[in-house]
């Protein structure tokens, strides 16, 4: 005759076993425990596969981050190269020549060495994009600086009114808008608050807008070309 008390205790033990779930803090612990447990090999292999995939995913994430950093770096440099190609460089250097020279690794390393953002973050090896962008913007501010652009723009401003007086009515509006942008550049350069770095973006934008329409042929005296501003 069975003892109800013993059977009840056994049932409670079985229920306790079936309801108890292991709480593993680490996937490596789970991996070790699976090796010790007597479970079907198919299940064990599947769990091992999941653990390995998890570990590989971590490594893949780091690799993807590195690739993303490299892509961002290339995009940033390419964007700055495009700006240089649009604006041209100092001393009459053609814009396309300047941008292509950026693709020379040796020159690029010289430009970016020391504080110019080739340094890596000590923790994750990521490119310091803030420092890199600051370095490239510094170069941009030199190309669009008062020392390079002010005199040729003043020459254009001085001769523009006479040209507009004799210009065809169909062409006047476009040239007047161009003239206003030239004046705006000069106003920025002559302002007591002018700052080459701070104002580089607006000067760059204005010069690009000026170049959207070819400069009047009678006003071209090579001064803009000498400053590195293509006249189209």
Curated annotation (Swiss-Prot):
One Pfam family per UniProt: Pex19
Gene Ontology, cellular component aspect: cytosol; peroxisomal membrane
Compositionally biased region (Acidic residues): 25-38
Name one process (GO BP) from the record: protein import into peroxisome membrane
Q: Which GO terms describe its molecular function?
A: peroxisome membrane targeting sequence binding
| Chain positions covered by the region annotation Disordered | 1-71
Reading the lineage from the top rank, the first entry is: Eukaryota
Give the protein's recorded name. Uncharacterized protein C17C9.14
> Which species is this record about?
Schizosaccharomyces pombe (strain 972 / ATCC 24843)
Record's compositionally biased regions (Basic and acidic residues): 44-71
The family database entries (InterPro entries) matched by this protein are listed as:
Pex19, Pex19_C_sf
């Amino acid at each position: 005759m069975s003892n109800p008390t013993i059977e009840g205790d056994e049932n409670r033990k079985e229920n306790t076993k079936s309801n108890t779930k292991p709480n593993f803090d680490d996937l490596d612990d789970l991996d070790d425990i699976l090796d010790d447990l007597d479970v079907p090999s198919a299940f064990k292999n599947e769990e091992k596969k999941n653990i390995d995939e998890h570990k590989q995913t971590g490594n893949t994430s780091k690799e993807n981050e590195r690739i993303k950093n490299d892509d961002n770096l290339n995009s940033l440099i390419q964007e700055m190269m495009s700006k240089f190609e649009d604006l041209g460089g100092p001393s009459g250097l053609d814009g396309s020549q300047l941008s292509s020279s950026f693709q020379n690794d040796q020159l690029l390393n010289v430009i970016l060495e020391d504080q110019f953002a080739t340094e890596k973050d000590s923790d994750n090896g990521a490119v310091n994009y803030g420092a890199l962008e600051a370095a490239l913007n510094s170069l941009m501010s030199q190309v669009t600086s008062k020392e390079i652009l002010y005199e040729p723009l003043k020459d254009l401003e001085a001769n523009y009114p006479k040209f507009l007086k004799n210009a065809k009515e169909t062409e006047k509006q476009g040239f007047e808008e161009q003239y206003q942008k030239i004046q705006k550049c000069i106003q920025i350069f002559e302002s007591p608050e002018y700052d080459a770095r701070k104002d580089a973006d607006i000067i760059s934008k204005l010069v690009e807008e000026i170049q959207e329409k070819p400069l009047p042929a009678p006003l071209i005296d090579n001064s803009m070309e000498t400053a590195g501003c293509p006249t189209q």
